A protein has these predicted regions:
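Conserved residues at the C-terminal ends of beta-strands
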Residues: 100, 151, 222, 270, ...
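Structural preference for beta-strand elements that scaffold enzyme active sites
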Residues: 147-149, 185-187, 218-220, 266-268, ...
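Beta-strand secondary-structure signal
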Residues: 52-54, 64, 149
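Short secondary-structure transition/capping segments
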Residues: 38-41, 160-163, 199-202, 434-438
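Extended, hydrophobic interaction surfaces within ordered domains
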Residues: 36, 52-54, 78-86, 268
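Conserved Radical SAM active-site core
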Residues: 60-62, 69-215, 225-254
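Solvent-exposed segments in extracellular or luminal domains encompassing
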Residues: 42-47
Length: 444
C-alpha cells in the first residue's frame, strides 16, 4: 500500500512548531518511533508531555526534534491533507443514493461518494461502516473517536444488504454492539423508502437501535429524496400525506415509550414529515438538544424560536426597507409567517418571499439547500426584489469556495444577472432578523 506523505502546508503563528522553526514543505515522518497513518494517529501520538518527532526538511535532511509541552497542547502544524491520508470512497450502491440521481454535467467532485469514519468524527458525516474491518472499529474505540454517525437505514441484515447492494452490510448490529461495548457515543440515521424499510421494518429498526441507549443518543428518520434523474435506478415511490401520518404516529409512539423508560426521545422524524402531513412542529423539548439538525430534524422549530427571540430585541431606524427572501417549498410557509410577524412590528419594512421550484433536480426536491443558481436566475429575473436578496447559507457548496452554488454559478454572477446585492443568511433565526433589517450584511 502506498505510504501517504504528511507534508506541512502552514504553521500556526506563535505555536510550538514556529518555535521549533518548522517550515511549510517539511514532512513529518514519525512520532516516538511510530509511523503515522492519518490524522488520528497524529493527534493520538502528540498528546503527550514529551515527544520525539522525525521530520524531513525541504532539502531531504532528516532530523529528530525533541518537544516538551503540556499534555494536550497543540503543536501548530497544518497539513496539506486534513485527513493526512486519502479519502475513503463508498463501496455501496444504495437504492436511495442521491449522488446517483444528480444530473449529468456537474463538476466531477460532486459525484464523489465518501464513506470514511474519520470524516464522521471530524465533520459529522454519516457512514455505513460496510468498508470497515474489526481493526478499524478497534481503532475508533482505542482513540475514543466519538461521536460516530452511522447510516443504519435498517437493522434487518438481509434487507440492509439489498438496500445498500453490499454483501457486507448485514453486520450492522454486530458492529454497533462492538462500538457500544467500547463505550463509543453514536448517532443514527434511517433514510426511509416507501414499501422497503418502513412499516414493520421501521418498528424493528427502532426497537433494535433503542437497545443501544444511552450510547446511541439519537436516530433520525428522513424520507428518501427523489430527483428527476433516476433512469435505470431502483423504482422508488414518493411518500404522501397519509404515509407521513403513519410515520409520525410510529415515531411519536416510540418517543413516548422511550422517554418514559430512559428520559430521552431518541427517535426523531425530520421536519419534512411534519410539513408533508401539515402538522405543527414538535415542541422544542422533544428534540433533545437538537442532535440531528444536519439531518433536517428540528431546523424549523429552532429557526422559529431564535427568530422570535431576535425579534423581541430588534429595533429599526424607521427608514423604509424592501428585501426579498428566496426559499424552497418546504420552508416557504414558515418563512412567510415569520416575515409577516416582523412586518407587523415594523411597518416600514417590506419582505417578499418567493418559493423557488426546483427544476434543476426535479420538483419533488423541495428543500432550500438544493436550490441552484439556474433556478434562481430563471424565477427571479425581472421581478422587483427590493434592495437586497436574502439566500440561505446552505445553498453554498461546503468545503469549497463559499461563493459557489451547486450548479457552479457564483454569487457575484447571480448578483450581476439579477442586478441586486445578495446577502447570505446563516442558519439561525437571529441572523434572519438581522439581515431583513439590514444589520450585518457584510458576509463572511
Amino acid at each position: 500500500m502506498k505510504k501517504h506523505l504528511h507534508v506541512i502546508q502552514s504553521i500556526v503563528p506563535g505555536s510550538i512548531a514556529e518555535e521549533m522553526e518548522l517550515q511549510p514543505g517539511y514532512t513529518v515522518l514519525a512520532i516516538n518511533g511510530q509511523d503515522i497513518e492519518d490524522v488520528f494517529d497524529y493527534h493520538y501520538l502528540v498528546n503527550d508531555e514529551y515527544i520525539e518527532m522525525l521530520i524531513r526538511t525541504a532539502d531531504g535532511t532528516e532530523e529528530v526534534l525533541e518537544i516538551e509541552k503540556d499534555y494536550d497542547e497543540d503543536i501548530g502544524i497544518v497539513f496539506e491533507s486534513s485527513l493526512m491520508d486519502d479519502y475513503r470512497s463508498c463501496s455501496n450502491n444504495c437504492i436511495f443514493c442521491f449522488i446517483d440521481q444528480l444530473p449529468k454535467g456537474m463538476r466531477e467532485t460532486m459525484y464523489f461518494k465518501d464513506d470514511d469514519s474519520r470524516l464522521s468524527f471530524l465533520q459529522g458525516n454519516y457512514i455505513t461502516m460496510t468498508n470497515m474491518k474489526d481493526e478499524a472499529l478497534e481503532r475508533i474505540i482505542r482513540y475514543k473517536l466519538e461521536p460516530i454517525n452511522v447510516s443504519v437505514h435498517t437493522t434487518n441484515p438481509e434487507l440492509r444488504c439489498m438496500m445498500l447492494h453490499n454483501r457486507f452490510a448485514g453486520k450492522i448490529m454486530e458492529q454497533l454492539q462492538k462500538l457500544y461495548e467500547g463505550g463509543i457515543i453514536m448517532n443514527g440515521q434511517i433514510v426511509l423508502c416507501k414499501n422497503v424499510n418502513d412499516g414493520e421494518e421501521l418498528e424493528r429498526s427502532i426497537r433494535d437501535l433503542s437497545g443501544f441507549i444511552p450510547n446511541i443518543e439519537s436516530v433520525s428518520v428522513v424520507p428518501v429524496g427523489l430527483s428527476d434523474h433516476r433512469e435505470g435506478l431502483y423504482p422508488l415511490e414518493p411518500f404522501n400525506r397519509e404515509d407521513a401520518r403513519k410515520v409520525i404516529a410510529c415515531i411519536e409512539k416510540w418517543q413516548k415509550k422511550l422517554y418514559e423508560e430512559y428520559g430521552t426521545h431518541f427517535i426523531h422524524a425530520s421536519d419534512e414529515w411534519y410539513l408533508l402531513e401539515g402538522y405543527e412542529m414538535p415542541e422544542e423539548e422533544r428534540y433533545d438538544g437538537y442532535l440531528q439538525l444536519e439531518n433536517g430534524v428540528g431546523m424549523i422549530r429552532l429557526l422559529t424560536e431564535e427568530f422570535h427571540e431576535g425579534l423581541k430585541e430588534a429595533v429599526t431606524d424607521g427608514k423604509k426597507r424592501h428585501v426579498t427572501i428566496a426559499t424552497g417549498h418546504s420552508a416557504v410557509g414558515t418563512i412567510r409567517k415569520l416575515a409577516e410577524e416582523l412586518c407587523e412590528k415594523f411597518p416600514n419594512v417590506t419582505v417578499d418571499v418567493y418559493e423557488i421550484v426546483n427544476h434543476f433536480f426535479g420538483e419533488q426536491i423541495t428543500v432550500s439547500g438544493l436550490m441552484t443558481g439556474t433556478d434562481l436566475k430563471e424565477q427571479l429575473q425581472g421581478k422587483d426584489l427590493g434592495e437586497t436578496l436574502l439566500l440561505p447559507v446552505n445553498i453554498l457548496r461546503s468545503g469549497e469556495d463559499v461563493q459557489i452554488l451547486l450548479d457552479d454559478i457564483t454569487i457575484p454572477e447571480l448578483e450581476n444577472t439579477l442586478q441586486i446585492p445578495i446577502s447570505i443568511v446563516q442558519s439561525n433565526g437571529q441572523d434572519l432578523v438581522d439581515k431583513i433589517l439590514g444589520r450585518g450584511e457584510i458576509d463572511e
